[in-house]
């Protein structure tokens, strides 16, 4: 977990200031949530079978034997706060937050167990306009920070119904090739089969490339939504690459998902729509999108 020294903080503060100006220009408001939340919040919203919850969270029991966890991401806490304070009922909201997150991962270049993230969330908005806004806004951030060696990848996970149908098709496909799956993929097969598509095992690359494609299982609503998003990005000159193997490791993603990385190797930003999350927490307010980096 890194320490930020005075000389480094000057650069950090400059970057943060530039980001805040752009977020403010799009009418996003700051929200601050606790570093600690009840573990069950992340289990319900992120998904108990995800790698984040099952392997990567820092969790402990307090003096009342209540399980608490350091936040591994920001969205769950923002949703909880919005529902508890009635911020989503019959209204739209745009929030941003900034701060440290924690995951017990293997430390490596560019990846730390404490990492800092900027999070943008929009609630109560329907249609692809809000997805386009988040991507265009993020593109402005990269441009203003003089970061241009980046690659934006896009995919659509569709509605919760189309995702469920695709999941069943995927399980059937991989069961027919079960002898070719590695240990991690065998564990994911029943619990989170879409994560197999994200495997870095080169020996499984051909098998994954031949797997059923999500695009072939999208309903018409999802197809229209995604195509509209692409047209909006094209009109704003946003470059992207379609990646049908792109999935997110958290259960609450539906609709368009994106993954932005430096062409070298790092991953500064990812985003996706989170319709399922409010349902799991019991809140209303329609669709929404969000991103963090």
Predicted regions and their residues:
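Single conserved hydrophobic/aromatic residue that forms the stacking wall/gate
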Residues: 261, 268-293
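TRNA-recognition modules of translation machinery and tRNA-sensing kinases, especially anticodon-binding
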Residues: 1-263, 280-282, 293
């Amino acid at each position: 977990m890194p320490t930020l020294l005075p000389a480094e903080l000057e650069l950090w503060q400059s970057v943060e200031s530039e980001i805040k100006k752009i977020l403010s220009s799009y009418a996003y408001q700051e929200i601050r949530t606790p570093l600690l939340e009840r573990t069950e919040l992340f289990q319900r919203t992120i998904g108990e079978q995800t790698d984040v919850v099952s392997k990567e969270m820092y969790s402990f029991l307090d003096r009342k034997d209540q399980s608490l966890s350091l936040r591994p991401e920001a969205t769950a806490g923002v949703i909880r706060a919005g529902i508890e304070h009635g911020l989503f009922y019959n209204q739209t909201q745009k929030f941003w937050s900034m701060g440290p997150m924690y995951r017990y991962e293997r430390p490596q270049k560019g990846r730390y167990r404490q990492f800092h993230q900027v999070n943008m969330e929009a609630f109560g908005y329907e249609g692809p306009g809000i997805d386009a806004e988040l991507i265009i806004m993020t593109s402005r951030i990269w441009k203003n920070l003089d970061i241009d060696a980046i690659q934006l990848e896009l995919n659509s996970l569709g509605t919760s119904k189309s995702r469920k149908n695709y999941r069943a098709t995927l399980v059937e496909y991989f069961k027919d090739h079960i002898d070719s799956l590695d240990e991690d993929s065998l564990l994911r097969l029943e619990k989170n089969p879409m994560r197999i598509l994200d495997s870095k095992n080169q020996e499984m690359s051909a098998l994954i490339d031949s797997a059923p494609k999500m695009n072939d299982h999208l309903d018409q609503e999802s197809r229209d939504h995604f195509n509209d998003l692409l047209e909006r990005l094209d009109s704003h000159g946003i470059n992207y690459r379609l990646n049908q193997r792109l999935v997110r490791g958290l259960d609450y993603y539906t609709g368009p998902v994106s993954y932005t990385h430096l062409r070298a190797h790092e991953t500064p930003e990812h985003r996706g729509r989170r319709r399922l999350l409010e349902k799991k927490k019991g809140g209303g307010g329609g669709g929404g999108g969000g991103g963090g980096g």
